[in-house]
Curated annotation (Swiss-Prot):
Pfam families: DAO. Its cofactor is FAD. Keywords: FAD, Flavoprotein, Oxidoreductase. It comes from the Bacteria. Gene3D superfamilies: D-Amino Acid Oxidase, subunit A, domain 2, FAD/NAD(P)-binding domain. Catalyzes the dehydrogenation of L-2-hydroxyglutarate (L2HG or(S)-2-hydroxyglutarate) to 2-oxoglutarate (alpha-ketoglutarate). Also displays some oxidase activity in vitro on L-2-hydroxyglutarate with O2 as the electron acceptor, but this activity is most likely not physiological. One of its GO terms (molecular function) is (S)-2-hydroxy-acid oxidase activity. Belongs to the L2HGDH family. This is L-2-hydroxyglutarate dehydrogenase. Its EC number is 1.1.99.2. It is an enzyme of class 1 (oxidoreductase). InterPro entries: FAD-dep_OxRdtase, FAD/NAD-bd_sf.
């Protein structure tokens, strides 16, 4: 059976690039096809850039296992490759007695996930660490950090290309089919429309992964989950923040609450909130600032008026809807759908960035398993 290229990875976000890197470094011929003009233009560049510890996810879930594994891989990779990062630590803060009671459950879940470095601290001790903070109790997570996600993606791209991979842009997948003799035939649009055949197809298209899977003739529709769009807005802080750590409220449904994160330059941003939407619209409504002021002042009461400026928005690629429990990552290989050579990645929301290197490992294992 002749093919034009051995492996095609759809999507040049952080996970797609990590997978392309792993495939290329294993000796395979790899083409990365990205619909837009550059790497990381979707969810990968519209997030909090946090290296998560692995605290919140159900024990035994892919999110829990791959976040913890990915965190260790990512810190080692960034240190080795000079990708900017900081292990700042995080405080999960309770501002009511009811929330304080929830901290023990969070700590128990973290321990079940292999995260054993959380520390309970009193409100007084938390406020000694961060004098601008107001809380009744907190959990300290010393292994939480931040990373320059674009530098990370550039490094993954460089690794992949150094191992022989090729990245092409403005190349959206229009349709595809499973070939009877094995492999895939793919039709791409864009400026240079083309048809390619390949042995291996990795669908790492983020928000568009379910829609892309539906374009592949021969893949059972029952193996493609319904997708939902959950928008999150961010506001940036004018001036310097009086915090040296990330500050997270006790999590609420569908997200981790309006948290305070810092970038590598020390600039603070707040978000994301949770807004279920029907279309992929990245417009930020400045009026949402009112809700942000209220949320942030629950733990930083001295937040000045007019201190928040509209930042950006992101959309979580969810495969569970409003009022449903959060879904786990789905990495659907041949064992799941019966199509040799195909892996679909669905619902790769947070902690996808943290988990990227571990997701690549898992994808190759499911491809070959």
């Amino acid at each position: 059976m002749s093919v034009d290229v051995d492996c095609v990875v759809i999507g040049a976000g952080v996970v797609g690039l990590a997978i392309a890197r792993a495939l290329a470094q294993s000796g395979r011929e790899v083409l990365v096809a990205e619909a837009t003009e550059a790497i990381g233009t979707g969810t990968s560049s519209r997030n909090s850039e946090v290296i998560h510890a692995g605290i919140y996810y159900p024990a035994g879930s892919l999110k829990a296992r791959l976040c913890v594994r990915g965190k260790h891989l990512l810190y080692s990779y960034c240190a080795e490759r000079g990708v900017p990062y900081k292990r700042l630590g995080k405080l999960i803060v309770a501002t009511t007695t009811e929330q304080a009671a929830q901290l023990e459950g969070i700590a128990q879940r973290a321990r079940a996930n292999g995260v054993d470095d959380l520390q309970f601290i009193s409100g007084e001790d938390a406020m000694r660490l961060e004098p601008a903070l107001r809380c009744t109790a907190a959990l300290s997570s010393p292994s939480t950090g931040i990373v320059d996600s674009h530098a990370l993606m550039l490094s993954f791209q460089g690794d992949a290309e150094n191992a022989g991979a090729q990245c092409v842009f403005h190349t959206p997948l229009v349709s595809g089919r499973v070939r009877p003799e094995g492999g895939f035939e793919l039709q791409f649009g864009g400026d240079d429309a083309m048809t390619l055949s390949c042995n291996v197809l990795i669908n790492s298209a983020g928000l568009h992964a379910p829609a892309l899977a539906r374009r592949i003739d021969g893949l059972p529709a029952s193996n493609i989950p319904k997708d939902y769009l959950c928008k999150g807005s961010y506001f940036t802080l004018s001036g310097r923040a009086p915090f040296s750590r990330l500050i997270y409220p006790v999590p609420q449904h569908a997200g981790l609450g309006v948290h305070l994160t810092l970038d590598l330059g020390g600039q603070a941003k707040f978000g994301p909130d949770t807004e279920w939407v029907e279309t992929e619209d990245y417009t930020l409504d400045p009026a949402r600032a009112d809700v942000f002021y209220e949320a942030v002042r629950s733990y930083w009461p001295a937040l000045p008026d007019d201190a928040l400026a509209p930042g950006y928005t992101g959309i979580r690629p969810k495969i569970s809807g409003p009022h449903e429990p959060a879904a786990d990552f789905v990495i659907a290989g041949p064992a799941a759908h019966g199509v040799p050579g195909l892996v679909n990645l669905f619902g790769i929301e947070s902690p996808g960035l943290t988990s990227s290197l571990a997701l690549a490992e898992e994808t190759l294992a499911r491809l070959n398993g």
